Amino acid sequence: MGTEKYISEVKVIASPQEAVYQRLSNFKNMEQLFNPDKLTELKKQHPEMPDLQLENFQATEDECSFSVSMVGTVGVQIIERTPSKTIKLAGSKSVPFQFSCWIQLAPVDEENCKLRITLHAELSPMIKMMVNKHLKNGIDQIAEALTKIPYV
């Protein structure tokens, strides 16, 4: 097993840093966004938004789980918060491999902020061959999708 590191592109979000942090640091705030009707509405408003193919999203304040095509059920928990700056996540209960993830926020100005996602995944060589490209693309798609959701 080896630890692989995946870093998203830096994305700019057209919302204040604190508003973005408040939305992302509580999984219950994300729950409404992942119902099929809301995803369809967001996709119509932002046709360039990537199709994340998440299903069965369930959440508490600190944990969530969802199904991802070609991966299966993924459980995620928030393990650390640094107000307005960082949200650290880790795999919980049901994950196909162990991982940790950081969502980093930085101000651009009072009305905009930057976001970057870093993923560390424990992958066997065989699993890495199968999912390496999907993880890199997926982390960029998630970062891009996070620029499209409403924060204020």
What are these regions (language model features)?
Residues 90-141:
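Beta-strand/loop substructures that line and gate deep hydrophobic ligand-binding cavities in soluble
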Residues 1, 66, 93-94:
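Short Gly/Pro-enriched turn/cap motifs at secondary-structure boundaries
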Residues 42-90:
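Glycine-rich portal/gate segments that line the openings of hydrophobic small-molecule binding cavities
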Residues 12-16, 69-71, 81, 106-108, ...:
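Solvent-exposed residues in well-ordered beta-strands and their adjoining turns
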Residues 6-8, 71-76, 97-102:
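Short, surface-exposed coil-to-beta transition loops
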Residues 20-24, 30, 78, 89, ...:
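Hydrophobic pocket/interface hotspot
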Residues 1-56:
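Hydrophobic ligand-binding cavity/cleft-lining segments
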Residues 28, 135, 139-151:
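Short amphipathic alpha-helical signal-transduction/dimerization elements
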